Amino acid sequence: MSALHQTQSTYKGAPGRALWVSTGAFTVCFAIWTIFSIIGVRIKDELGLSEAEFGLLIGMPILTGSLVRIVLGIWTSRYGGRLVYTITMLAAALATFLLAYATTYPQMLLAGLGVGLAGGSFAVGVAYVSPFFPPEKQGTALGIFGAGNVGAAVTKFLAPFVLVAFGWQAVAQVWAAALLLTAVVFWLSTEDDPQFRARRDVGAPRKSFLSEFEPLKNVQVWRFSLYYFFSFGGFVALALWLPRYLVGVYGFDIETAGMIAAAYSIPGSIFRAYGGALSDKLGARKIMYAMFAVSAVATAILSIPAGGAGSAMPILVTPMVFVVVTFVLGFVMSLGKAAVYKHIPVYYPSHVGAVGGIVGMMGGLGGFVLPIAFGFLKDVTGLWSSCFMLLFVIVAVSMVWMNVSIRQIKREADRGLPAGALAR
């Protein structure tokens, strides 16, 4: 069989259906997860919310969707991704539909908890999809799945039209109906993953719930989490922060700033699939080194002090330079997101759910915490560019930690230590 035929056949049949249907489902889930980015503005006006209340409202799904990832990942290992993914989508669809009937702020927050389940679907999808593919194809497969992040752009582009025509409640109802339909299609067109099916067929006892957390004792898991905190959390944070930055520093109108932010989000999501393919071909470690090197240079350039429009401080980074460098940063972040998840099934093939869940949780928390940190630094320093100074510090720490750990792994390998000792 030719190499080309082998590659093509890998993405056909049950593996192909699992990958493409899961990716479509994750795209819809991500669109649901970010629904407050559009309807939240109208809700804020209707309820007369303060800025703090508004921030909590739009952040609630991001926070809960991040925290629930580790639990959903473990449940996927125990009960199978097909079942857990379907139930997660049904629960999120119900919460999104009920959101349309919420009339008070506490009700909105409660609905936001349920909407956040859609964001937790990432951990389910990773644990479900990876067993369908051999190790040399998992980077590409998980990169394609992760490209479902583009669902955020779907909401940004389509939801405003529905909102203007029919109101924010209609957005919630239509998005809920889409997720319900997606859950039905997913259940009817997929099957259980090979690992879960094998355990079920031989009647293998389930691991205890606590044993699922065993890999979390490895420092390596938390190192991967820091990488994803930057590559995914930093990417999401910049997507949220860029409109405010462009308006505050360069005086752009909100429409232009919003379109630039949307243009930053779309390729940044799609190129994740390319990052997975590169990780399979060149190795995830090389991709991580490249991401950190380029990110360090980019964040250093963007850290050049900028006081903003109306400030006496000169703006040394022109709008064109800023947009180009930011897009380069977003591109390498997308490659890095895929490279991080290429590592997980290689190092932890029996704990993809738990490890993928904790890494995904930390990345999601980055998307929640970093915008708050950006605002705090702006208030304290008066510099808009302080957000990139923070990102530079995170990149530097990650790069040093990675380099030290890899050197330690190589030294231990040269001494012939067992594989378990290499989890640094």
Locations of regions flagged by a protein language model:
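Extracytoplasmic gate region of multi-pass secondary transporters
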Residues: 36-37, 219-270
